[in-house]
């Protein structure tokens, strides 16, 4: 594929009755920076295959000053994880009403973070009193009893307007919960509000032009990640114990990496997407953002409708068998990210985990496959919105949606065929290993407003760079967890990913818990 000509772009947009020829220069520029990845896809042969269906430095003084240190019983409560809060509520040593009051107060005191779009304090208190009455009657509300949860404003929440982070749709108050939210409520969770996001969940920095740019609570001036930046910021700032996120190319794991916390993307379709505003049907996943692996496990159990305590064993976890890819995931790395990954793998090996190295044929095609798939599906899902209200969209999201119209059916189909081949290569690369360990991002969290970075002597665009190691896991549909493994010399967080085979969510969570316990020693 060569760079699309102005004539081609003009003809396609006219055919689709999207008459905005004045935007041709923007469309051409947008194609230019992804062209090399796209060309790799078109120059690759397709085998006969079906289309896929569906070391840590001390914090600097400035960052250390931003850390939240508990100094009272109330502070200890908001710092507690979901498991601890639920335990205290279930044994009636802690009132849901007290929890609601404390977290609502913290959310109000941290409005400058723009972590939430809507908080209905009356509804939160009403739900808390209902939980309290159930406890007084001797009922067990469930495994998330009284746990404060922030839900990405991409999902229907009863009594809240659904905005999808945009002004291009009418924000209607929802009469019922999305399936995942209903499960959280049924497990006793307190929904404390809907969280901010990158508009339409289509971006990596959560710089929302309509509801305010989400701020990184611990690393001021750096992005919180996206698109689930509000959920990550809320959890990192202890405004919620669990954040619900969506992930199309890395939107759970990448914000977790930018905020130095935990983000779990389950196997594709393990968590229902009913009632969730779509971006890309074959890439969208729903999962939890938390401050610990244990909290991620209990949240996932509820979100996926699984039995309590089914993800993490009550006994000691043995050293796992680990595989490390030789190329791609360990190429084009920031030096400090490489050092942190080397140190983490050395710790795992010293603790008894055998680590093998493998090649993954075709993995270099991943960026192009993701670009074509996401652009095509994202534009299809939002075409009516773009055609009718494109002028109400933020410029970055509008441009992404506009350029998706120029991919042809043959482009999309070939990308899916190659996607299936890469998926099979990824599965084969595990061999007899339990998990694959890779970096969450090739670079440190960038400063807000950064468009390009220098990496290995090359100038690279921020968006595809930050999702380079997460998006292949999305289009393969594998479970993966992002968790802290170190910090840079300046104190910025560095996360690794624990990746498993499709359906091996429990294995990923158990290995991640083993890694977490090892880091705490």
Model-based region annotation:
Residues 109, 186, 236-331, 342-351, ...:
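Structural helix-boundary/capping segments
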Residues 93-101, 129, 335-359, 383-388, ...:
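Acyltransferase
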Residues 18-19, 82-90, 105, 196, ...:
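Serine-dependent amide/ester hydrolase catalytic core
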Residues 1-119, 123-125, 350-351:
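An N-terminal boundary/leader segment
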